Amino acid sequence: MYTSVLLNVESTILDFWRLLKPRIMYLVVFTAVAGMVTAPGSMHPFLALISLICVALGSGSAGAINMWYDRDIDLLMERTKNRPIPSGRVSAESALEFGITLGILSVFIMAIAVNYISAALLAVSILFYVFIYTIWLKRRTPQNIVIGGAAGAFPPMIGWAAVTNSVSWESFILFLVIFMWTPPHFWALSLNKSEDYAKASIPMSNIVYGPEKTRKYILIYSVLLVLTSLLPALFLKKALLYLSMATFEGCVFIWYAVSVMKFKNHSSQKKMFSYSISYLFSLFASIIFCSIDLF
């Protein structure tokens, strides 16, 4: 009996954890770290930790509210039908309350403990993801990912603002890198999940314009991404080293995009999607490494 109760509690905790979309949250926090490290000045380690926790909670808040709103279409898609809400393991009301609570807490703590600018940016990123992307764009236009991608591009700006109490062109460049990365990343996924998106009536690019045009868009955005990814060299301490690292990582990205156009199959699209995640981690790791003095 006692073991059964413990298992139920553990299962519930895991389901609420899944509402936060942890894989996205890890990436969000990592890019926020890049913003903090590249920013001029310094920050007390404890406040830096508080800032990152707030970013994580804010990201999780947006994820939970997104799952609450999308519970109807999640039920229709193979990829999402086993999520906590459509599977019935977490009630829609509980998920919404959980998401709103986390969002309010994250912004409030950021404002009180860190500064108002970083808190405002965090609030904008949450609201943009929920209202602009989830509620307005996702079900209405194939530009959903293009415009909606801005929501996930805020973390480096938030990290920068946490340190400097300001927004600058440098942090906006980091924003642009993620903004340009988002479309090819999600289009590679959507090409392999066309039936799911069609069943849920989500107007992804490949559903509206067809797979051929979408593959061309992937290549175009990949080239634009790689060009944008070179811009941080303008303010990083090890500019030449960063340029070489970003160029290599970017060439591999374009190679995968070309493979998607050339082979037009599930395998090439899956590899493109997988590499795009590794690419963003690697690129921002390069940004972090090239902004600190180790030798």
Swiss-Prot record:
Protein localization? Cell membrane
Record bears the keyword Cell division: no
The answer to whether the entry has keyword ATP-binding is no
Substrates-to-products reaction catalysed: heme b + (2E,6E)-farnesyl diphosphate + H2O = Fe(II)-heme o + diphosphate
Question: Per the UniProt record, which EC number(s) apply here?
Answer: 2.5.1.141
- Which pathway or pathways does this protein act in? Porphyrin-containing compound metabolism; heme O biosynthesis; heme O from protoheme: step 1/1
Q: Which GO terms describe its molecular function?
A: protoheme IX farnesyltransferase activity
Keywords on this record? Answer: Cell membrane, Heme biosynthesis, Membrane, Transferase, Transmembrane, Transmembrane helix
Q: Which Pfam families match?
A: UbiA
How this chain sits in the membrane, per its record, is: Multi-pass membrane protein
**Alphabetized CDD domains for the sequence:** PT_UbiA_Cox10 (cd13957)
Transmembrane feature ranges: 24-44, 45-65, 94-114, 117-137, 144-164, 171-191, 216-236, 240-260, 272-292
Tell me one GO biological process term. Answer: heme O biosynthetic process
Q: Which domain of life is it from?
A: Bacteria
Q: Which Gene3D superfamilies match?
A: UbiA prenyltransferase (1.10.357.140)
Q: Which GO terms describe its cellular component?
A: plasma membrane
Q: What class of enzyme is it?
A: transferase
By sequence similarity, the record places it as follows: Belongs to the UbiA prenyltransferase family. Protoheme IX farnesyltransferase subfamily.
Q: HAMAP family recorded for this chain? A: CyoE_CtaB (MF_00154)
Additional facts recorded: Carbon 2 of the heme B porphyrin ring is defined according to the Fischer nomenclature.
Q: What does this protein do?
A: Converts heme B (protoheme IX) to heme O by substitution of the vinyl group on carbon 2 of heme B porphyrin ring with a hydroxyethyl farnesyl side group.
Name of this protein: Protoheme IX farnesyltransferase
